[in-house]
Amino acid sequence: RGLGDVYKRQIPHGSYHTKQISDYLVQFAKERNLECSQDDSNNVVIRKAASAGYEDAPVVILQGHCDMVCEKTADSTHDFEKDGLDLMIEGDYVTANGTTLGGDDGIAVAYMLAVLESDDLQLPAIEALITTDEEIGLLGAAALNGNELKGRTLLNMDSEEEGILTVSCAGGMTAMMDLPVRRSEVMGEQMEVTISGLAGGHSGTEIHKNRANSNILAGRFLYELAGK
């Protein structure tokens, strides 16, 4: 099958709901007699032996994540936990009807499965590493046992532009904070404040645009009120 056929698999795979897609990946490997492992976080590693003549080449890890951001239009009845995506293909473009596409990072998983399934490519030994819950904090990667991997060269397939390779990587940090809170009953008029209508955007690729952030604005608003 081609790359497009692999991508069109109708399996719900939102963050926190990756068991079904993870099990499909395991079944994919078993049907092709490929070595495979799956951990408690639903991370999957699929291994393909080197092509003839490439047995001594270093193992290459291909890595991507299988969860997606689940957003839909206001009038959509799509259930991300039960329904597959309604894909529309126009020429070279694939879109989803009324929902996010999941191209981040479904395209990486599709590429990896196409590579694993191909008998025409001449390649070194491949380890396809598919992690989970990337969109909500890299949770699958954090739970991964690195000893499962033999390769020392990793190609992350979760970038923004084709044809561009970035050497090294970006990192992340999670901070756990305990703030002392004293609650007291306050009498008087209550008011609900909503901040909406902002442009939104990607916190990584568009952070330099200095767009308004509702969390920051809410914090500033409360800070100013506290000083009144």
Regions picked out by a protein language model, each given a short descriptive name:
Residues G84-L85, E90-T99, E134-I136, A141-K228:
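Midchain, well-structured core segments that form catalytic/ion-binding scaffolds
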Residues Y54-A125, I130-I136, A141-R152, M187-Q190:
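Active-site metal-coordination/substrate-binding segment of hydrolases
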Residues G2-Y7:
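Short, small-residue-biased leader/transition segments that mark boundaries at the very start
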Residues L25, A29, V109-L116, L144, ...:
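Buried hydrophobic packing segments
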Residues R9, A29, N33, C70, ...:
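Structural signal for hydrophobic packing residues in well-ordered secondary-structure cores
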Residues Q38-D39, A125, L225-K228:
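Flexible, glycine/charged-enriched surface loops at secondary-structure junctions
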Residues G14-P58:
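A non-catalytic alpha/beta surface segment that caps or lines the substrate-entry region
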